[in-house]
Design a protein with these regions (language model features):
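Replace the tail clause
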Residues: 1-300, 304-308
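Short, intrinsically disordered, charge-balanced linker/junction segments flanking boundaries
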Residues: 309-316
């Protein structure tokens, strides 16, 4: 319920209690009984946890992992940040190199793939293929909130400065997307942004090669290499979904750019494309605001503050 509807419900309860107090009391007693029936005290006995069972489950888990593109072997592919966060925690606590490397690969693949919005930030709900290339373009608050926490935790657990910066950029861009598109005047965040705009799925997010050439001019020569603008990567109707085949750091080396220069060039082009894209019909917003999903975002922002010591994240 939003605030208006919730107040309406509360007033209705008050009126019912005034006119039919016995009925309300009977309902309250029934509710209490139902809660008591579902309450289970913690047993005094020690847990029957067995390390062998967990290790067996981990072995079975590893058999389901996609070692080439991250995530699981089945499609469609969902990011499933809670799964990855478990693997990251278990991998670090048990020094399980396989799980640690799998999480790292998955985080790079989804952030470089088409499931990530390379212009305004934020992740789509899932990929329709094994390569994270073609997403279902809907963006959900709960996914992005958990991914903010996950990328923040990954940043805390790396000693590589370039990798840390990569994770940080993804977190900041993703939160920037949520702040700009889903935040309400009251401070809460809305549930989702639709996949469709102007009668087509993904139309807001995709580009033709001719559009990019016209907008980017001389920058197109390197942009097409970084974001795989080639005939064989075209999606449909001459449209391209932006995606990277390598990290920005590796690409920068080929261009003889320093890392700071690479980030500056990409950020400059993103601003240009973002301004052009905002002239299109935007996907509609789901105007519900759910406490549980907002709580996930609060958790993500707390993790990001710990990882990056960004006061704005904590204040938000």
């Amino acid at each position: 319920f939003n605030q208006h509807k919730w107040l309406k419900v509360l007033k209705a309860i008050v009126e019912t209690y005034k006119s039919e107090p016995k009925r309300v009391e009977e309902f309250a007693q029934e509710m209490q009984r139902n809660l008591e029936d579902n309450y289970h005290e913690r047993p005094d006995a020690k847990s029957n946890y067995e390390a062998e069972r967990l290790e067996g489950w981990i072995t079975s888990l590893k058999e389901t992992l996609d070692n080439s593109f991250g995530g699981y072997k089945y499609v469609p592919k969902f990011p499933l940040p809670n799964h990855l966060d478990f693997m990251l925690s278990y991998g670090n606590s048990m020094n399980d190199v396989v799980l640690k490397n799998h999480v790292r690969k998955t985080l790079f693949c989804i952030a470089n793939g088409g499931i990530y919005d390379h212009i305004e930030g934020g992740f789509a709900r899932y990929s329709t293929d094994a390569y994270w290339k073609v997403p279902h373009f809907e963006k959900m608050l709960y996914d992005n909130a958990q991914l903010i926490a996950l990328y923040s935790n990954a940043a805390r657990n790396t000693s590589d400065a370039s990798e840390y910066r990569f994770y940080q950029a993804i977190v900041y861009e993703t939160f920037g997307y949520l702040f700009d598109n889903l935040k309400t005047p009251s401070g809460s965040y809305l549930c989702a942004q639709d996949a469709d705009s102007g009668g087509s799925e993904g139309g807001y997010y995709c580009w033709t090669e001719s559009e990019l050439k016209k907008i980017l001019k001389t920058d197109f020569s390197w942009f097409k290499d970084l974001y795989n603008i080639r005939p064989e990567t075209c999606w449909e109707n001459d449209l391209f979904i932006l995606q990277k085949s390598e990290s920005l750091v590796d690409f920068a080396r080929k261009q003889n750019w320093k890392e700071d220069e690479a980030y500056a060039n990409v950020d400059r082009v993103k601003l240009t494309l973002s301004a052009c894209r905002k002239m299109r019909i935007k996907p509609s917003i789901d105007t519900k605001s759910l406490t549980s999903w907002n709580a996930l975002l609060l958790d993500g922002l707390c993790h990001s503050y710990v990882a990056f010591n960004n006061q704005e994240m904590l204040d938000e």
